[in-house]
Amino acid sequence: MSPVDFKDKVVIITGAGGGLGKYYSLEFAKLGAKVVVNDLGGALNGQGGNSKAADVVVDEIVKNGGVAVADYNNVLDGDKIVETAVKNFGTVHVIINNAGILRDASMKKMTEKDYKLVIDVHLNGAFAVTKAAWPYFQKQKYGRIVNTSSPAGLYGNFGQANYASAKSALLGFAETLAKEGAKYNIKANAIAPLARSRMTESILPPPMLEKLGPEKVAPLVLYLSSAENELTGQFFEVAAGFYAQIRWERSGGVLFKPDQSFTAEVVAKRFSEILDYDDSRKPEYLKNQYPFMLNDYATLTNEARKLPANDASGAPTVSLKDKVVLITGAGAGLGKEYAKWFAKYGAKVVVNDFKDATKTVDEIKAAGGEAWPDQHDVAKDSEAIIKNVIDKYGTIDILVNNAGILRDRSFAKMSKQEWDSVQQVHLIGTFNLSRLAWPYFVEKQFGRIINITSTSGIYGNFGQANYSSSKAGILGLSKTMAIEGAKNNIKVNIVAPHAETAMTLTIFREQDKNLYHADQVAPLLVYLGTDDVPVTGETFEIGGGWIGNTRWQRAKGAVSHDEHTTVEFIKEHLNEITDFTTDTENPKSTTESSMAILSAVGGDDDDDDEDEEEDEGDEEEDEEDEEEDDPVWRFDDRDVILYNIALGATTKQLKYVYENDSDFQVIPTFGHLITFNSGKSQNSFAKLLRNFNPMLLLHGEHYLKVHSWPPPTEGEIKTTFEPIATTPKGTNVVIVHGSKSVDNKSGELIYSNEATYFIRNCQADNKVYADRPAFATNQFLAPKRAPDYQVDVPVSEDLAALYRLSGDRNPLHIDPNFAKGAKFPKPILHGMCTYGLSAKALIDKFGMFNEIKARFTGIVFPGETLRVLAWKESDDTIVFQTHVVDRGTIAINNAAIKLVGDKAKI
């Protein structure tokens, strides 16, 4: 296999004075490239300028025998950066859009200035540089572009509405460039790296930063920039030696008859089906897809029109009575239909349009509804728009950001004015109106935002670089607002409509006209504006009677544990990096994604035996060490009642809260508490680890078995702890730690526990100490069908304060400052509390169990709502998941209970 090289290739790297950009520059130069090292040299927040950063990198390249030139221009002056390349080297072949700054702030505090500054550097700078290089790419029939996105761009991130917007916009930009560049051999891709840089050093703990060197990211960038790369329009997640493609997955969705029976009520009735990715019983046209373009709406609407009228029997009531809704761009087209529908469901509608909106208002009033006109331009009059709403109705409940313009043009011919004007309406306008409505939502603890994107934003589209990037930016913005709004009951969702309007008329074929009416989109929007909408941060595609959900799907990927990963590793493992046939994941948050990546990176089954240098005699020496006495835990009915109440028991369930009840009992997960009431628990396995730091421990799974039924409600329990297995995972260790708890007087075995911990930055021997029960090792994958049972479990804002009294006093769960130090916006709920809440919900439905196993896959904040989904897999086994309704994440997965009785009560 011939090595990848960049001989005679000219590479521009923006933001190359440090971090990722610096490392890229050095590596490109080593492989023969002529490098333009661009860096303004400013501070991380974008202030100032200093040429030294770029000069230092160039000096190092030249010292090592490479060729490079420094460039000190702002990325907004992209033509000057390209001019530097052309003057020195004659052309440009590769652009790495890497420059970036941070201006983090919550939605409540973020200013338009902070928002636009980040958009300018990340997105508009990428546009300026790429636009200036495009003619050279076209002329030489060769170009490579790598846009630097981020996990925040994929999933949103608290306090980063600006950054997430820009980073997701770069995805849509890359997709459109890929489509337009195809005939010129111009390949455009995007990466979402988690790497050590000036930016991440300020937000990640040092132990994690050690794993996130730029040397782990560069090999992928080098490959995507090479002549050998044939991939284009693709996205990749990369961190710590993990490389995987991530792509869009679209659910088969639901077809509705597109007639008068298509209402918000029938959408509400079948809403869970829209989100269901089990397509095993669906026809071919409703199978899940992994698309690069909009759906086959011609087939979908044709099939939808064959259906009988929609059945609304049993559908929930949908009402927006007295809700105040602002709909932008509602003077005509989609917005007008939305306004009429919201009014029909009882809302007070403020009809915004930069033209006269009175016609829509008059139609609403004529139909018996209430409406008020607003004639302002969302691009520049956002404050006046919100003021008009408040002056008229005193508040705002729902915001539909619908206003839009098109300025379609091929990228080669697109002007900066055409780029800016589309961005100002779609992206800046959406941010500003959301920002200004936010305080009213927070004050009343209710808000609904529906942001209108486009399939051009999700998949890119020829001739729409401006539109697709802005609409893609709305995705990251919306997901961030959904995360931030969760604690205040502010829900934000995204809709990509396919409908015929005056603005979109030119893109429809003649035979498609009059098939995709705007009123076929409105039923979904009405439901998304209601009190009862169960999701936030979700993306929907809709048109012609079809509604589907769109999410990320990530390949299993490839992992390199080499200290110096080369571009050849990417080349040799490209099939694995882009393989979606097995072990795919659907991450929905930066936490979920990074935890899965961390776990994957740990999975090095090929560690050399020679790394294990412990003397065999150490084991014997350990046995001679003085041992702590096995702890004895004394508990009574007070401890039992306190624990039961923390898991939701009430006075309507006396068996849990009244010690004199004839059926007084404890929820079985009580049996894990001994591990938090004994110092020996951790001490007993710490001696097996080298360089162990308890701050780097993650509780990954927990298995518990009740051996004596029913479990006692008072007594003395003596517990012995023992390791079950230690498994090195690269520079990390997975340890399975066991305990057995017996009655201190009779010696009868009461409980056994197995806790699986993932511990970073330590070493251990690869050793199995004891066998494990089959139930503990079963993966318990959730079936690809609708659950047999589901129930929502509200989590009190104060639950962590109560639950910690049972033993787990970790300040992470109560102290805001400690939580911030751990990079959480506020204290998180105990994982074992989520475990117990789920267990009680299952007991209430199915009856008691004596075995439970679960994997922790996400965090829960007090005040959120859990949704426990359960599947009956056999007479005595119930598989379950626990979701966080507010953020659309999964907190517990790969979980099951084994019932005490013979059969499940279902």
UniProtKB/Swiss-Prot annotation:
GO cellular component, one term: peroxisome
Binding site for (3R)-3-hydroxydecanoyl-CoA: 699-700, 729, 757, 808, 810, 831, 856-858
S-S pairs: none
Gene3D superfamilies given in the database record: Hotdog Thioesterase, NAD(P)-binding Rossmann-like Domain
Induction, as annotated: By growth on N-alkanes or fatty acids.
Domain of life: Eukaryota
Reaction(s) this enzyme catalyzes, per UniProt: a (3R)-3-hydroxyacyl-CoA = a (2E)-enoyl-CoA + H2O; a (3R)-3-hydroxyacyl-CoA + NAD(+) = a 3-oxoacyl-CoA + NADH + H(+)
SUPFAM superfamilies found in the cross-reference section: NAD(P)-binding Rossmann-fold domains, Thioesterase/thiol ester dehydrase-isomerase
Region (Short-chain dehydrogenase like 1): 5-228
GO molecular function, one term: enoyl-CoA hydratase activity
Record comment regarding domains: Contains two SDR domains.
Annotated protein name in UniProt: Peroxisomal hydratase-dehydrogenase-epimerase
Species for this entry: Candida tropicalis (Yeast)
